[in-house]
Amino acid sequence: MFKELIWVKENSLTEQFCKSVIDKFETDPYRKPGEVDQNNPRIDKDLKVTIDATITHNISWREEDDVLYKALGKGLYEYEIYLQDISLGKWNLHPSDGYRVKDTGYMIQKYEPNGFYNWHHDWCMSEGWSRIYTYIWYMNTVKEEDGGWTEFIDGTKIQPKVGSILLFPATWTYV
């Protein structure tokens, strides 16, 4: 059942959009070494080696933020339909107060060769909401022989393909 909850949809974003995001990111003055722990942000190269830029609330990224918001809404909707299909209606995935999404913003992360983000989970609870899904968009394609992939604790590996979105539960079982 573990693998079934990991879902990839190709062409969630266009290749042209992804290229423009990469180009803009490369010149963004707010890029910085990746930090861990949103409650106590710090650089810890034993846990994460990335270059990050948070684009939400940055006026120069407003158009991209809007595209990502719409694509995420569509992706979440399709993912939940997929989950209902594989569960044969056994799971109720909609919260009792209806389908609401809290947009917590978007961060672009660049992994240089040998960069990584160590095993972790993304579940959190804050201000009356819970994060239940994690999503990753791939802005570029990485060949398997080049060693870039997203790997789960059960050994499942997802190969990055430009424009694809990856969705999975944010809980500890999907580190």
Question: Each PLM stretch: what is its role?
Answer:
Residues 1-166, 171-175:
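Fe(II)/2-oxoglutarate oxygenase catalytic core
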